[in-house]
Amino acid sequence: MEGERMNAFPSTMMDEELNLWDFLERAAALFGRKEVVSRLHTGEVHRTTYAEVYQRARRLMGGLRALGVGVGDRVATLGFNHFRHLEAYFAVPGMGAVLHTANPRLSPKEIAYILNHAEDKVLLFDPNLLPLVEAIRGELKTVQHFVVMDEKAPEGYLAYEEALGEEADPVRVPERAACGMAYTTGTTGLPKGVVYSHRALVLHSLAASLVDGTALSEKDVVLPVVPMFHVNAWCLPYAATLVGAKQVLPGPRLDPASLVELFDGEGVTFTAGVPTVWLALADYLESTGHRLKTLRRLVVGGSAAPRSLIARFERMGVEVRQGYGLTETSPVVVQNFVKSHLESLSEEEKLTLKAKTGLPIPLVRLRVADEEGRPVPKDGKALGEVQLKGPWITGGYYGNEEATRSALTPDGFFRTGDIAVWDEEGYVEIKDRLKDLIKSGGEWISSVDLENALMGHPKVKEAAVVAIPHPKWQERPLAVVVPRGEKPTPEELNEHLLKAGFAKWQLPDAYVFAEEIPRTSAGKFLKRALREQYKNYYGGA
């Protein structure tokens, strides 16, 4: 088979290497006057253009070279969404180096660990994160230069504007060479490193931008709420640059009022982020009666969007699409849209369809498989693990052979650890993380299904459901609920769940009311902390 492939009939096509720098070069040439708008940490709104970003990215290349950065060296960033971070998104890969977007929401210990593990040579960071950098600076073994992404810097640090050098030419590295890296933000163990190639992120940006995905075009105004330190900001800065769309980068202020000001003031048509941001925005819009002037499409990722959230935004004229991915998958591998022959379904049926995770995007091979790697029936009921193959799926973890071995199946699929069902149309519906499924009396209960149903109750703002040890049933669900105003009674919530189709044995045995639910750095519920806090609640630990 390998021999047949080697002896295949040759094509006449040019062998041009894929490179992220080409996105910015095209945007500067064709859409050079298109704006890139940033809200900085000070609240100031900064305006630039693709032509200026291109020129300054070339100057950043020159400046980094003067600091000793060469092909293959790692350059880390600790920063939110703004124009300087966008310049680094292109300059670092463009010079053949590797952009390591580190997550400032990790603990200082974890940040020091990943910067040392990646052996970063230069650290670019936002000025408001100076206390964090000062706290870990003494622990960093390889960082030689600390650059504050601002006009000025305190003594002992270099200001970004002063670090810019003479314009330098890009370096055309092989398309399979590394261009970026990120570390997982899981709830167990040390973060694991994933290294992205130019080829992976170019193909990912193209596939995710198709009409049945984000459907980005030059006419769009794109505001990524997802941070640029989180899995390439779902590749939106790359994809928006690819098509020449205006970009609005919101900085660290993601409260509803600040977002609405940017949405309306800049004519934003497309945005993307995690459900918690959109739940808060929906509450704000409904309480104020405000209607967004230009927003038309909204992507939800990071965790499942409750059906009620989709319905709320659709009533406001905003189309909501689910997306799914992981750090290990660059990240997007699944996006939701309604197939043409299903458009005749009732609005309720279509809403049910939109609440599913979606369909694998082009070039991604996806299966929902049992423990032996065999696909489970496409009946919408049989549970299996989501397993993936594709040009932007990781084949392992950086410097971690043990984690690499456990992450891959014998036939080379990546094991996500996410449990799902799929139906005859191919729609995937993530039910839970493997570690978050609740096994009660030998039967499985999905915590995600319970959470999404509970958040559809008018008196529930947020809900997290966890498995708690039980002396008789092995595990039973416990729901931690943040009320919306008046606190609902357990009886009200149980009645709501029964009406939603849950059996009595699937209902939580207890409801705990709280002011907030702890979260991971990626905005997901920190269920490990809840399990630890309530482990003795049923007397089964």
Swiss-Prot record:
Database matches in InterPro entries: AMP-bd_C (IPR025110), AMP-bd_C_sf (IPR045851), AMP-binding_CS (IPR020845), AMP-dep_synth/lig_dom (IPR000873), ANL_N_sf (IPR042099)
Chain sites annotated for binding tetradecanoyl-AMP: G302, Q322, G323, T327, D418, K435, K439
EC annotation from Swiss-Prot or TrEMBL: 6.2.1.3
Enzyme class: ligase
Cofactor: Mg(2+)
Organism domain of life: Bacteria
Ligand binding (Mg(2+)): T184, E328
GO molecular function, one term: ATP binding
UniProt: ATP binding residues: V231, W234, G323, T327, D418, K435, K439, W444
Keyword Calcium attached: no
Pfam families (UniProt xref): AMP-binding, AMP-binding_C
Keyword Magnesium: yes
Catalytic activity: a long-chain fatty acid + ATP + CoA = a long-chain fatty acyl-CoA + AMP + diphosphate; tetradecanoate + ATP + CoA = tetradecanoyl-CoA + AMP + diphosphate; hexadecanoate + ATP + CoA = hexadecanoyl-CoA + AMP + diphosphate
This protein's pathway: Lipid metabolism; fatty acid metabolism
Keywords assigned: ATP-binding, Fatty acid metabolism, Ligase, Lipid metabolism, Magnesium, Metal-binding, Nucleotide-binding
PANTHER family xref list: ACYL-ACTIVATING ENZYME (PTHR43859), BUTANOATE--COA LIGASE AAE1-RELATED (PTHR43859:SF4)
Subunit structure: Forms a domain swapped homodimer.
Function: Catalyzes the esterification of a number of long chain fatty acids with CoA, resulting in the formation of long-chain fatty acyl-CoA. Myristate (C14) is the most efficiently processed fatty acid, followed by palmitate (C16). Also catalyzes the esterification of stearate (C18) and laurate (C12), but at lower efficiency. Does not catalyze the esterification of the unsaturated fatty acids mysteroleic and palmitoleic acids in vitro.
Family, as annotated: Belongs to the ATP-dependent AMP-binding enzyme family.
Further comment found in the protein's record: Upon ATP binding, the fatty acid-binding tunnel gated by the aromatic residue Trp-234 opens to the ATP-binding site. The acylation reaction proceeds in two steps, via the formation of a fatty acyl-AMP intermediate, and is proposed to follow a unidirectional Bi Uni Uni Bi ping-pong mechanism.
Identification of the protein by name: Long-chain-fatty-acid--CoA ligase
Species of origin: Thermus thermophilus (strain ATCC 27634 / DSM 579 / HB8)
